[in-house]
Swiss-Prot record:
Organism lineage string: Eukaryota, Viridiplantae, Streptophyta, Embryophyta, Tracheophyta
Cofactor(s) essential for the protein: Mg(2+)
PROSITE patterns reported for this sequence: FBPASE (PS00124)
Gene Ontology MF terms in the entry: fructose 1,6-bisphosphate 1-phosphatase activity; metal ion binding
GO cellular component terms listed in the entry, alphabetical order: cytoplasm
Keywords, alphabetical: Carbohydrate metabolism, Cytoplasm, Hydrolase, Magnesium, Metal-binding
Binding residues for substrate: 123-126, 214, 246, 266, 276
Protein name as it appears in the record: Fructose-1,6-bisphosphatase, cytosolic
Listed PANTHER family: FRUCTOSE-1,6-BISPHOSPHATASE, CYTOSOLIC, FRUCTOSE-1,6-BISPHOSPHATASE-RELATED
Main location, first listed in the record: cytoplasm
Note: In plants there are two FBPase isozymes: one in the cytosol and the other in the chloroplast.
Enzyme kind, highest EC tier: hydrolase
Length: 339
């Protein structure tokens, strides 16, 4: 982009966007804006580390082959450290739940704030070596009391989240965010170092022609999932078959589903009867975004955002995407329940 030639354009950065949203609420003190700024900073840091990872491993930048190689292997740990520090230093968080940490992190009272953040610092990190898109997923809750924070402050249904999003590190770095009033996508301009609004008010198509699932697990699926995937491949109503697209990185698969429509499935199976994806920092944020974009998210039993987790690393099956596509698999589960 020629920034001098396009200087007249009204570039909406993510900070300006959130400040504009904040101005709609006169009682707002800017706490959420500060918190989000720190999340954005974490995303920029991780994006830079991910982009250098393969190069550092191959040629050893500045001769630090061993150190860089070690960092490459532990990029998910590095990402976790970055986000924990960014969130604590914001002074706006009280409880942090990360995919990398067995226990929740409770922020000391001198730096404590009113928000609880659940996150997966680097989802799909096993794909780093082959250059596949990976990402950070996050969800934000508000503490409704001034008592000592506990895990109960995050063990709440997803419909109580105040914001959710993900940052995808791929051919471009894109942050997709919802604060409960629609879904917006921001792309990182490397020359500016700013996330610019490039995808305002994202709406998922009502029906799609893509399904996304790991068919390697097909022999272990339940009846409704098996029937649904068969319908996708061999429709009996004369409609064209759906195309299979599966990256194996949740952020990449959900991002494509959000933009192009279709359905993402990660069902329970005989090996993982409770599902594989974690409720708090994978299922809930993605379900929140899908609903805000006009889609649906279903667990096989209920609306995903109505789940009430009992443990911070609890797992669940998930079916999310275009409204009509999810409606179809819901009907198959309802049919099985009747029988």
């Amino acid at each position: 982009m020629d920034h001098e030639a396009d200087a007249f354009r009204d570039l909406m950065t993510i900070t300006r966007f959130v400040l504009n949203e904040q101005s709609k609420y006169p009682e707002s003190r800017g706490d959420f804006t500060i918190l989000l700024s720190n999340i954005v900073l974490g995303c920029k840091f991780v994006c830079s580390a991910v982009n250098k990872a393969g190069l550092a491993k191959l040629i050893g930048l500045a001769g630090d082959t061993n150190i860089q190689g070690e960092e490459q292997k532990k990029l998910d740990v590095l990402s976790n450290d970055v986000f924990v520090k960014a969130l604590v230093s914001s002074g706006r968080t009280s409880v942090l739940v990360s995919e990398e940490d067995e226990e929740a992190t409770f922020v000391e009272s001198s730096k404590c704030g009113k928000y609880c953040v659940v996150f997966d610092p680097l989802d799909g990190s096993s794909n780093i070596d082959c250059g596949v898109s990976i990402g950070t997923i996050f969800g934000i809750y508000t503490m409704e009391h001034s008592d000592e924070p506990t895990t109960k402050d995050v063990l709440k249904p997803g419909n109580e989240m105040v914001a959710a999003g993900y940052c995808m590190y791929g051919s471009s770095c894109m942050l997709v965010l919802s604060t409960g009033t629609g879904v917006h996508g921001f792309t990182l301009d490397p020359s500016l170092g700013e996330f610019i609004l490039t995808h305002p008010d994202i709406k998922i198509p009502k029906k799609g022609n893509i399904y996304s699932v790991n068919e390697g697990n097909a022999q272990n699926w339940d009846g409704p999932t098996t029937k649904y995937v068969e319908r996708c491949k061999y429709p009996k109503d004369g409609s064209p078959a759906k195309s299979l697209r599966y990256v194996g990185s949740m952020v990449a698969d959900v991002h494509r589903t959000l933009l192009y429509g279709g359905i993402f499935l990660y069902p329970a199976d005989k090996k993982s009867p409770n599902g594989k994806l974690r409720v708090l920092y994978e299922v809930f944020p993605m379900a929140f975004l899908m609903e805000q974009a006009g889609g649906q998210a279903f667990t096989g039993k209920k609306r995903a955002l109505d789940l009430v987790p009992k443990k911070i690393h609890e797992r669940s099956p998930i079916f999310l995407g275009s409204y009509d596509d999810v409606e179809e698999i819901k009907a198959l589960y309802a049919e099985e329940e009747k029988n």
